Swiss-Prot record:
UniProt keyword Oxidoreductase, yes or no: yes
Name of the protein in question: Pyruvate synthase subunit PorA
CDD domains named in the record: TPP_PYR_PFOR_IOR-alpha_like
Protein's gene: porA
One annotated GO biological process: response to oxidative stress
One GO molecular-function entry: pyruvate synthase activity
Species of provenance: Pyrococcus horikoshii (strain ATCC 700860 / DSM 12428 / JCM 9974 / NBRC 100139 / OT-3)
């Protein structure tokens, strides 16, 4: 029977890893995700998880260790955040290029400088081009569920790509919420044994992995990574459908909330989706035709789902805790690319909010709504990007 309890998202991630039964875990502690490997090391030490826990001297070594273990043919897991993920950057490309279905938990935290240990999405958003599938959790239950789903998708032979699951620093990592721990037997049936055919250590079947590719072959290798990410779209939908049947919880790449008659729809990710939905309820009571959408899958980018959502809106706004310096927020950039060839598309606005753990308030969302209403009234967007909640007296 499932166990209903309360726990932090870090603990939920550790429980998900335990349920998935990885054989090798390597990690280096970093705020705010330190509790994830700590809890897993307890499971291993207590004999609750039959796995090798490798203590390393850096995050670069942690990801390198799980790359080696995955290349040897076993299920692996790691966790990190912020500068730790940035330090892993070099090896993330290697994991994807070698087609290793590693799963990693990310306690989404801002990047230095200045040093900041609080939440935004800059760390994982900055890895969007590495070839890793990316999921984002709204709450602690989703942190657990999405890690299980990450294994299901990553290990599918049509995909064979690594995956990361992000959940907001402190807002989720250190906050206790109700969580249902699934039954181990059901998880075993859902995931099955990891039996790779492409990468495993066998003296009778010697292979070379991570080898040099000349110009005559390199481009095709990269194409196959891109193609696998494209195939992951269907696999994710299939995994979501099976997960709902087995566990009773429904997931979608983009989850819509009160969008059917909305003129203005705001899109976000992570725990901010909860705030946004509560704010939409308040605005609906005040008579505003506003809706919300939560993006659970960021890579592969949900192109068709964004196009379907855009057809419902007159104004599509993105509330995001990241910034691509030199242009706009990354989610807005990707959504704009997804809609570029559409004959009809809504007015689009980007709102940068909550960087470095700053609270995103109803007042800030009211500011975003005011800007969206002005664009709707004028029928054009004069300025696509707006920083909301900015303390102008400090500039």
């Amino acid at each position: 029977m499932p166990i209903r309890t309360v726990m932090k998202a870090n603990e939920a991630a550790a429980w998900a890893a335990k349920l998935a039964k990885p054989k090798v875990i390597a990690a280096f502690p970093i705020t705010p995700s330190t509790l994830v490997p700590e809890k897993i090391s307890e499971f291993v030490a207590n004999g609750e998880l039959d796995a090798e826990f490798i203590k390393v001297e850096s995050e670069h070594s942690a990801i390198s260790a799980v790359v080696g273990a995955s290349a040897a043919g076993v299920r692996t897991f790691t966790a990190t955040a912020s500068q730790g993920l940035a330090l892993m950057h070099e090896v993330l490309f290697i994991a994807a290029g070698m087609r290793l279905p590693i799963v990693m938990a990310i306690g989404n935290r801002s990047l230095s400088a200045p040093i900041n240990i609080w939440n935004d999405w800059q760390d994982s958003i900055s890895q969007r081009d590495t070839g890793w599938i990316q999921f984002y959790a709204e709450n602690n239950q989703e942190a657990l569920d999405l890690i299980l789903l990450a294994y299901k998708v990553a290990e599918d032979e049509r995909v064979l790509l690594p995956a990361m699951v992000g959940f907001d620093a402190f807002i989720l990592t250190h906050t206790v919420e109700p969580v249902e721990i699934p039954d181990q037997e059901v998880v075993d049936e859902f995931l099955g044994e990891y039996e790779p055919k492409h990468a495993y250590l066998d003296p009778k079947r010697p292979i070379t992995q991570g080898t040099l590719a000349f110009p005559a072959h390199y481009m095709e290798a990269k194409y196959l990574v891109w193609d696998a990410m494209e195939k992951a779209r269907k696999v994710i939908d299939e995994a979501f459908a099976e997960f709902e049947k087995r566990f009773g919880r429904k997931y979608q790449k983009i989850e819509e909330y009160k969008t059917d008659d909305a003129e203005i729809i705001f899109v976000t990710m992570g725990s901010l989706a909860g705030t946004l939905k509560d704010w939409v309820d308040k605005k609906r009571e005040e008579g505003y035709k506003v809706g919300a959408a939560k993006m659970t899958v960021y890579r592969p980018f949900p192109v068709e789902e964004i196009r379907a959502l855009a057809k419902k809106a007159k104004v599509l706004g993105f509330i995001e805790k990241d910034i691509s310096i030199g242009l706009y927020g990354a989610v807005f950039i990707d959504a704009s690319a997804a809609l570029v060839n559409e004959s009809e598309r809504p007015l689009m606005l980007d709102f940068i909010a909550g960087l470095g753990g700053r609270d995103v308030t109803f007042g800030q969302l009211d500011d975003a709504l005011r800007i969206a209403e002005e664009a709707l009234e004028k029928g054009e967007v004069e300025k696509p990007i707006h920083w909301i909640g900015l303390r102008k007296e400090l500039l």
